[in-house]
């Protein structure tokens, strides 16, 4: 996410009021710059609120939540992080739409992501399950939070590099932080959906959290949704599928989230295979451009 690099005076050359988004607020900040940063700050607030709900849930009853409304505190904790992910997905796009990118917005976004998708899921899962295995459980939570922060630091360090093989081919490096947070909650989704205490087993949750942490900092190529270009012949079918998924999220949200997680995990090997195919094609084109080796005298 990036924010307002171009600040306007709020007036055109003739002194008349210009774009309302360019009106300068007290302190020199423009409304254009404020909007995407406010969305990022809201995402951070949602992530922190998820921790608050988890603390409340851990201090009260620990039974399986009932279905429907009102939501249980464990459900609210997960939902808060998911909403943070939704806001994280739109703040950068809004910044680009408003032409409000800057270094400040990028740094704010990374700091917010490290808390909302690193610290918050780690603490929520620790309070829900891993505290029953105090030492190893805490190490698993710690590893997840640290790997999320390291992934974001790696992304920031590479952002200005010209040579990014994964990015230039339309792929990501490792699992993105918001997706990693959503995947980390898979045992919690299953517990809410089925009521089976086996999914709350701290050893199982700890191993799962360690696996997702590894995927976040790994160098494997993962599919970038923004680079997917469906063929015209299947676009209507894709719209129908998306509509069905949306309806399923409203009627059976937890089972639908389980399905989305499994679908994404099934696509990880496909991303690795697709990138390997792209690498082979690039190597073949480079070899063809270089021409045959010179003949020996």
Question: Where do the protein language model's features map onto the residues?
Answer:
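Short, amphipathic, aromatic/basic-enriched membrane-interface segments that mark the entry/exit
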Residues: 31-36, 104-112, 171-173, 224-234
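C-terminal membrane-associated helical module and adjoining short loops/tails
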Residues: 1-25, 169-297
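Alpha-helical transmembrane segments of polytopic integral membrane proteins
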Residues: 48-51, 83, 87, 121, ...
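Hydrophobic alpha-helical transmembrane segments of polytopic
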Residues: 39-42, 77-81, 140-143, 147, ...
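Acidic (Asp/Glu-rich) catalytic motifs at the cytosolic membrane interface
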Residues: 67, 79-123, 153-159
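Helix-coil boundary and interhelical linker segments in multi-pass alpha-helical membrane proteins
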Residues: 49-79, 121-142, 185-204, 251-255
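C-terminal ends of transmembrane helices
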Residues: 92-103, 149-167, 217-226, 272-273
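Topogenic membrane-insertion module of multi-pass membrane proteins
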Residues: 1-89, 271, 297
């Amino acid at each position: 996410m990036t924010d307002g690099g171009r600040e306007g005076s709020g007036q055109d050359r003739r002194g008349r009021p210009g774009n309302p988004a360019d009106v300068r607020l007290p302190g020199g900040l423009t409304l254009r710059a404020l909007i995407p940063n406010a969305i990022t700050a809201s995402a951070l607030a949602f992530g922190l609120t998820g921790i608050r709900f988890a603390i409340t849930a851990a201090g009260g009853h620990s039974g399986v939540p009932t279905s429907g409304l009102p939501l249980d505190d464990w459900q609210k904790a997960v939902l808060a992080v998911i909403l943070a992910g939704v806001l994280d997905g739109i703040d950068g796009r809004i910044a680009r739409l408003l032409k409000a990118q800057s270094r400040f917005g990028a740094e704010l976004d990374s700091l917010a992501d490290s808390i909302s998708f690193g610290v918050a899921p780690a603490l929520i899962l620790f309070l829900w399950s891993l505290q029953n295995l105090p030492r190893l459980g805490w190490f698993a939570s710690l590893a997840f939070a640290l790997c999320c922060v390291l992934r974001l630091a790696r992304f920031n360090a590479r952002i200005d590099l010209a040579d990014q093989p994964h990015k230039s081919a339309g792929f990501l490096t490792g699992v993105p932080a918001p997706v990693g947070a959503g995947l980390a909650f898979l045992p919690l989704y299953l517990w809410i959906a089925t009521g089976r205490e086996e999914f709350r087993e701290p050893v199982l949750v700890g191993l799962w959290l360690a696996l997702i942490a590894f995927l976040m900092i790994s160098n494997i190529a993962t599919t970038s949704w923004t680079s997917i270009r469906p063929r015209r012949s299947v676009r209507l079918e894709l719209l129908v599928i998306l509509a069905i998924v949306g309806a399923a999220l409203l009627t059976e949200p937890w089972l639908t989230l389980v399905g989305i997680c499994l679908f994404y995990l099934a696509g990880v090997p496909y991303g690795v295979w697709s990138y390997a195919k792209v690498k082979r094609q690039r190597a073949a084109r480079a070899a063809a451009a270089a021409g045959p080796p010179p003949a020996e005298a």
